[in-house]
Design a protein with these regions (language model features):
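The feature captures the conserved acid-bearing segment of alpha/beta-hydrolase catalytic domains
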Residues: 141-184
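The conserved beta1-alpha1 loop
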Residues: 26-30, 139, 165
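Short helix-loop-beta connector
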Residues: 105-108
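Serine-hydrolase catalytic machinery in alpha/beta-hydrolase-like enzymes
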Residues: 9-12, 20-103
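Gly/Ala-rich beta-loop-alpha elbow adjacent to hydrolase catalytic centers
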Residues: 113-118, 122
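Short, hydrophobic/aromatic-rich segments at coil-to-beta transitions
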Residues: 1-5
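Short beta-strand immediately N-terminal to the catalytic nucleophile in serine-hydrolase-like folds
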Residues: 111-114, 138
Length: 184
């Protein structure tokens, strides 16, 4: 299925799927993920469910997807803690725009997914909004400083949560990131 690019809040969002969807799927993306997006959507299409999928670019990966500020754990770039702004963009601009452009049933099931820091964002967003029926977090950055303490005090509101972890993440030489295996 080919993508349609829709400008939402000056961001070029890639939209796949159809109106009257049973599922409304969102994924915050970085440049590194766009090349594999068509394959991901092809796998989703095999479910034979009606869906509308929006790939939403994160303007600054470390800043836009981190729930609070934190120092760099590798390299020099820290984390800006702007996840609340990203969630607000999703709920106040992206969802209303898609509802305006595509007729969707009132009971459409909304699922938020992401990989790495976008996976952490999806988990965090589920603690902030009772909007998502499901969360899909692939190799989420649950090593993020303070995440485990936060998660214990703020339960997720999604009905379903999918977590996966690759073979290499917990074996990295970076001690902070290696905690992902214990934290997932």
């Amino acid at each position: 299925m080919s993508a349609q690019t829709m400008l939402i809040g000056n961001r070029p969002c890639r939209i796949y799927g159809e109106a009257h969807a049973e599922y409304l799927l969102f994924q915050m993306t970085g440049e590194h993920e766009l090349q594999s997006m068509d394959d991901e959507v092809a796998a989703i299409a095999q479910s034979n469910r009606k869906y509308l999928f929006a790939a939403i670019p994160a303007e600054s990966w470390n800043d836009a997807l981190s729930p609070w500020e934190a120092p760099a754990v590798w390299g020099k770039q820290g984390f800006g803690g702007n996840a609340a702004d990203t969630l607000r963009f999703l709920t106040e601009q992206v969802i209303p725009t898609l509802e305006q452009q595509y007729p969707l049933p009132e009971n459409v099931k909304i699922i938020l997914g992401g990989y790495s820091l976008a996976g952490l964002f999806a988990l965090w967003a589920s603690t902030q909004a009772n909007l998502f029926c499901g969360i899909a977090a692939a190799s989420p950055s649950v090593w993020f400083p303070g995440w485990m303490e936060f998660e214990q005090r703020h339960p997720m509101q999604a009905q379903r949560v999918y977590l996966s972890l690759g073979d290499k993440e917990e074996h990295t030489k970076n001690a902070v990131m290696a905690a992902v295996g214990d934290n997932i």
